[in-house]
Amino acid sequence: MLENKKMEFWFVVGSQHLYGEEALKEVRKNSETIVDELNKSANLPYKIIFKDLATSADKIKEIMKEVNYRDEVAGVITWMHTFSPAKMWIAGTKILQKPLLHFATQYNENIPWKTIDMDYMNLHQSAHGDREYGFINARLKKHNKVVVGYWKDKEVQKQVSDWMKVAAGYIASESIKVARFGDNMRNVAVTEGDKVEAQIQFGWTVDYFGIGDLVAEMDKVSQDEINKTYEEFKDLYILDPGENDPAFYEKQVKEQIKIEIGLRRFLEKGNYNAFTTNFEDLYGMKQLPGLAVQRLNAEGYGFAGEGDWKTAALDRLLKVMTNNTATGFMEDYTYELSRGNEKALGAHMLEVDPTFASDKPKVIVKPLGIGDKEDPARLIFNGSTGKGVAVSMLDLGTHYRLIINGLTAVKPDEDMPNLPVAKMVWKPEPNFIEGVKSWIYAGGGHHTVVSLELTVEQVYDWSRMVGLEAVIIDKDTKLRDIIEKTTK
């Protein structure tokens, strides 16, 4: 299982010496209380550390330098308790290389209408400080996040939590390594891309390996290891031979287990956390990896088919953000076009991510019409329901583009007893017709990463962190705006 690294966020509070030591003591006390209460709330995925008061340019620069070199620090949350002259923030903010959230809150929820005086105003002037600080971030084009509201409010805490998850993904992105077994599927356009630019902009390392390298690792797997894993399957899944001879069924499933163990070892040796395969490049293998891929997806590995390394890396990135919950590789396959009931059916030839499963997955063995190999084993299940996003990354030659489409996953209208793959059904925003049109005009690929844990805003926040063009297709989308933005 790939575990997310332990991370923390530093809380830095803006003020100045103008107000005197007694005021600064109160600022520090209030700051410590906020951090302590936020950590106790259990509403945040990572711990917040109160670092210090920011009362001089040298102090701020010193803090930001430390943020940059401390691997465990994923980002900075700033709060302006009082007015904090923003020229002090320029040097430190310029060198900050990690995500920044400006928390526009204040210690007290209410104005003490009957007793408020200038002492109170001088101490509790976040409204004043927020605007000065916000100006310098805008001037520096920092692409920071702004969260506004009372710090005890659960919805406000959720916004901070959502940003923390994205910031953790941003940090993890620098460590994403994709192993490509074989090249891209021949003649397919959208899966191509500039690997050097992806490493510069997103931190992704993409390495090629011949399929023989994987086969060599598979050959080292012992029968005892395979048998032990097969026994574990009896508790995890429904083993369904169907019309297959039981001995043949077991043999095919165990071949996928052999692939799984060999593949995992190969990835672990090279510290890879994402990978691709290609059904056109299977020399030396008996089956296209199916169940093997799905099992590794469940452990947090990113994946995409047909050599699509961009989507595999994106899959790993979003899995970090969601702690590998209801997030995975997907492909738009076919439409339901009945008026008023339009929707898309998503699947893939084998490798649908089991983090989507709404029921206990079933292991089946069926023929596969492509790849010219033996019948592969795979997990089948119905996908979960709920609101989420479909995300596609494409290389336009001049730059990368990220397309983010809000969606609602729904139950299928009927059972699909003859479809031998896992599947998910969804309705894109703002509606089926305009959603699909917008996707096509924007150049969106047929491969996506779907997540039922992330929001459009979270994925958009990541795009801003890395300076990536984003096309948002959601409930507020106007088709003409999409056309104007994407076809000039």
Curated annotation (Swiss-Prot):
Pfam families (UniProt xref): AraA_central, AraA_N, Arabinose_Iso_C
Pathway where it operates: Carbohydrate degradation; L-arabinose degradation via L-ribulose; D-xylulose 5-phosphate from L-arabinose (bacterial route): step 1/3
Binding site for Mn(2+): 306, 331, 348, 447
Keywords: Arabinose catabolism, Carbohydrate metabolism, Isomerase, Manganese, Metal-binding
EC number, as in UniProt: 5.3.1.4
Cofactor note: Binds 1 Mn(2+) ion per subunit.
Protein name, entry field: L-arabinose isomerase 2
Family note: Belongs to the arabinose isomerase family.
Cross-referenced InterPro entries: Ara_Isoase_C, AraA_central, AraA_N, AraA_N_sf, Fuc/Ara_isomerase_C, Fucose_isomerase_N/cen_sf, Lara_isomerase
Gene3D superfamilies in the cross-refs: 3.40.50.10940
Cofactors demanded by this protein: Mn(2+)
GO cellular component, one term: cytosol
Annotated organism of origin: Clostridium acetobutylicum (strain ATCC 824 / DSM 792 / JCM 1419 / IAM 19013 / LMG 5710 / NBRC 13948 / NRRL B-527 / VKM B-1787 / 2291 / W)
Enzymatic class: isomerase
Any GO BP annotation: L-arabinose catabolic process to xylulose 5-phosphate
Source species taxonomy: Bacteria, Bacillati, Bacillota, Clostridia, Eubacteriales
